[in-house]
Amino acid sequence: MDEGLSEAVKEIFISLYEQDYIYKGTRMVNWDTQLKSAVSDLEVSSSTENGKLWSIKYKTELDDYIVIATTRPETLLGDTAVAVNPDDKRYSHLIGKKVEVPIVNRMVEVIADDYVDPEFGSGCVKITPAHDFNDYEIGLRHDLDFVRCIDFEGKIESKDFIPNNLHGLDRFKARKEIINQLDNENLIHSIDDHEIQIPRGDRSKTILEPMVSEQWFVKTKELAKKAIDVVENDEIKYIPKAWEKTYFEWMYNIQDWCISRQQWWGHRIPAWYDSEGNHYVGRDELEVRSKNNLSDKMELTQDEDVLDTWFSSALWPFSTLGWPNDKKDLQKYYPTSLLVTGFDIIFFWVARMIMMGIFTMNEIPFKDILIHGLVRDSQGRKMSKSLGNTLDPLELSKKHGADALRFSLIEKANPGQDVPFDEEWTVAAKKFGNKVWNAAKFVHLYTDELDSYELTEIKCSENHWIINRFNQTLEDFNSLMITYKISDAYKTLYNFLWADLFDWYFEFAKTLISNDSSKEETQKTIKHIFLKCLTMLNPAMPHLTEEIWSSFNKENLIDLSWPEFINTNHDEDNYVEHLKEIISSIRNFRLTYSIKNSTTISLFSVKIQEDWFTTQLSSLVNAQIEDINGLNNEESTTIFQSGKFKFEVVASEYFDKEKEVNRLENKIKQLQKSLDVSKSRLENENFMKNAKQELIDLERNNLDSFSEEISNLEIALNSLKR
């Protein structure tokens, strides 16, 4: 409804009208009696429901009767014919004869039409051209009268030919009255259970009423042809490709688009009427008068209807970029490369954007269309108010942050697959955001003294390692994004940031920065890589990354180029991986035997050439490196080894061996009991049959966790018993 977008809507409407794509006509439409507005075919949600099939007797002029089957007896008030199949010999003698419509006592003709299915019901159908889409077409073919018996509020018309007791009744209450009256007159032949397709409005959920109404329409056949061609020629691609079939099915069967709505809010139709009902289209009343040479004395009234929401939405790719006035952004960003959307609005929005983009710009609006699934609840059920499982994204954003919600959905959503959303994902994403925020503080703390952070020569193995890990992450990320595996791409970035950069490299960096010879190189490496990662993270966490970026730089992060690889020539990355493995083993050693971090551990080893290796080891696990020759060969040791690096520790120096053996044995017994309980539950048929899936999954996770912990403790126990 912004001024610029409103102007774009007017321009497109006028352009379509002047090129004979928009017209005003009387046609059958889906009418929402609650919204009191026409709705387009695509806003109709049809479902199969249990209903009734009434077979009703219609008297013939031959003093006999025929049986008519209908699911909507209330519409017989508007019947203007009875139809049979021309090949149905049972009724050939009645074609051209008259029958009497019950209750209204209207004499109508029996007509022959191929539409009638001889196998359905009695093979005779009532024709109500004013209240049924198929009957409407039959009415046009046979030049029948269109008699409206239901008004725009869904009530029976107060007309002379309709009995007074039905005037103003709701259509469904009238149905009951009509059935009772038919039954009293012995005109009900039979009533059978029958499955019916019920059309409801997408928004109101009200059963829609087919109504003949004067509305504005867009001719779509020619527009659709061009929109079909660009997809068939691979100018526009659907991902997954299977959605092209859905697109083509809709487009090849497209009908003229009803674009007028009888609502208060929306873009008002730029058309004016004179006292005789003639309409004039223009940007405003002054233009209408000038263009059509209308006198200032002639009274004009603007159309009170507004345009379908999807009409203005169809202009989104170019109207939001300044069209038709400011075209600077339009020239830069149109067409865009990718549209990400849900399958449920492929025709509502996607197809119409393609049609309007080609019509207006003579160019496709986007090149690729990535279709994601529906967001469901954690159990995979569709969200609905009746189930009480709906989640308000605004409330989630207020509670956890918009970036946390955005990242959690991006990380979990795969193309074409539904997302069983769990709020815990957003909680985890919020923690990740906090981790990034704290990482920014770390980077500021250690790098703010730098005048420049451009990398030159890299000497430290730890810095080479993190640069190579970044390059590999960037390569993997780019490859995944190119193929639109966006979820996998951000999982890759998440793992690099949390595990490699924050958990490992930042710890290495503290040691390096404490040494003057490696300080500046490490400071530059930290800042260089962290800021590149912010750029990669920006599409998934725009608010957080822009805020952090602004604390380092003046320009907007979103305007920057995508990160490039960092040049490095170093092949000692595996040494850092060996270092990580040994550090992890020693930390597990402390944890297993309850050795405090403040306790210095003596590690015995042969002379290691890589001083940086032992420096990091000493710093990160509070270890003192000793010469292996100082180790008593008779003492039992625990060995930590990875690649060529080997360290031994005399475990008994740090705890009472006998007490530790008893502690481990008792711990294993406790865990074994817990494991047996989980195993018993999972082997219980009643539990597996009746328990909720999340409880079953929890028990399976417990079983795996207990098994792994027991295995680790048994290894430690056997080591002590050697």
Regions found by a protein language model. Give the residues of each.
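NTP-handling and nucleic-acid-processing catalytic cores
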Residues: 1-153, 159, 180, 228-260, ...
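Acidic, turn-prone loop/beta-hairpin segments
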Residues: 29, 33, 39-45, 273, ...
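Conserved phosphate-binding loops in nucleotide/dinucleotide-binding enzymes
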Residues: 47, 127-130, 172, 209, ...
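Glycine- and acidic
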Residues: 119-125, 159-164, 232-245, 301, ...
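Alpha-helical recognition segments enriched in aromatics with Gly/Pro capping
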Residues: 142-154, 262-266, 270-417
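Catalytic adenosine-cofactor/nucleotide-binding cores of aminoacyl-tRNA synthetases and other
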Residues: 202-204, 375-379, 383-459, 553, ...
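C-terminal low-complexity, glycine/proline- and small-hydrophobic-enriched intrinsically disordered tails
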Residues: 427, 550, 555-722
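Core structural elements
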Residues: 431-444, 463-472, 491-511, 678, ...
